[in-house]
């Protein structure tokens, strides 16, 4: 309708140069409320409260084959080893031993990614004898690392627990803004010696 105001969830400072019509108001990120982790998944809430958590969530549409998942597992292993060497009682102001929640969406191995079929009832490597377990065995067995195909609460709710000290994501606007808003001490150096390229995004 003529003269009607339109709010857009963006900022001119991060957009491509353009003329913004007078009836359009960039208002920045719109943060939607979400049910708490305690409401949606009390068991996960209790697990998160054990200690500072790295949350790996690469979005709904980013799938990994086994080689990529093993590469990420190796990064996780190095981060946990570095944390153990520090022997600190807290990370980013959160007390406890560093742990990892990793939402992993899997595909069948296909070099050309011609067919992105999601695994159904088949797991590659989180069980003993698999390649991921070979990298993260003790951490998986002790539940220090959780690898899941879906997290029931909204990602923003996981971040709002205050237990997440590092958010590894696919670079989407919601994930980026959620991490900046809810992660207390957003670490920019935790993975400084590790470079992982997943789907064009470098962590």
Feature map (PLM): residue ranges:
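A donor-sugar binding/catalytic signature common to diverse glycosyltransferases
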Residues: 151-202
